[in-house]
Design a protein with these regions (language model features):
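Conserved ABC ATPase "signature" region
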Residues: 109-125
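Conserved structural motif at the start of ABC-family nucleotide-binding domains
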Residues: 3, 18-20
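Helix-to-loop junction immediately C-terminal to a conserved catalytic motif
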Residues: 49
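Catalytic Walker B motif of ABC-type/P-loop ATPase nucleotide-binding domains
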Residues: 153-157
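Hydrophobic anchor residue at the start of the ABC signature
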Residues: 142
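Q-loop/switch helix immediately C-terminal to the Walker
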Residues: 84, 89-105
Length: 206
């Protein structure tokens, strides 16, 4: 998968959050957008996922054969883990994973039980998500990002709400997807992207 952004900008009321964004992103590479809080990292990631429309410029998703994807279909090819994305709290963990698998398969045809083991939450598999701690919810979000069989993975502030053990778990697994997928991060914590090949400051897009 290839993502191309050309002269992309996003404006809220009278303020440009990012502007003049030009990117050429490829599967097999990892990219981290860095900058202080409020600098536009999350906005840029949301633009690239299609969650929010650009005020100017164009973003294209291209298959390996060069075919351009319609924006309505981008979601099939990406997964996003972010603090502002909510899990369905009325589901148990088992129900949530089974629901997710209806829309996006897991790698190696992993089952819900495999997922629960991967995120180290087997004892909580029948617990409602609403009763999970913030750290447990973050593990679930990251687990879905790591295991979903899609070409593009977005991670926004990936160690948010994780303790030291959870951060080590993240670092152990994020490196396993680098090289085989297109990995895009938003972060101001160097430990979150120490593996990353391409570091891009959002201050360049002002």
């Amino acid at each position: 998968m290839q993502i191309i952004a050309q002269e992309v900008g996003k404006k809220f009321v009278a303020e440009w959050i990012v502007r003049g964004v030009g990117l050429d992103l490829h599967t097999g590479q990892s990219y981290t957008f860095v900058g202080p809080n409020g600098s536009g990292k999350s906005t840029l990631l949301q633009l690239l996922t299609g969650m929010v429309p650009a005020s100017e410029g164009t973003i294209k998703y291209l298959r390996p054969n060069g075919q351009e994807l319609e924006i309505d279909g981008w979601y099939k090819y990406l997964v996003l883990a972010a603090p502002y994305l909510e899990l369905i709290e009325e589901f148990t963990l088992r129900e949530l994973v089974d629901f997710h698998r209806k829309f996006k398969p897991l790698k190696n045809n992993a089952s819900a039980a495999d997922f629960e083991d991967f995120v180290q939450l087997v004892p909580a598999r029948y617990k409602l998500i609403r009763h999970f701690s913030s750290g447990m919810k973050q593990r679930v979000k990251l687990g879905l990002a790591f295991l979903s069989d899609v070409p593009v993975v977005f991670l926004d502030e990936p160690t948010s709400n994780l303790d030291a053990q959870g951060t080590r778990w993240y670092l152990d697994h994020v490196t396993s997807i680098v090289g085989s997928q297109l990995v895009l991060l938003g972060s101001n914590q160097p430990q979150e992207y120490e593996f990353c090949e391409n570091i891009i400051s959002v201050s360049a897009f002002k």
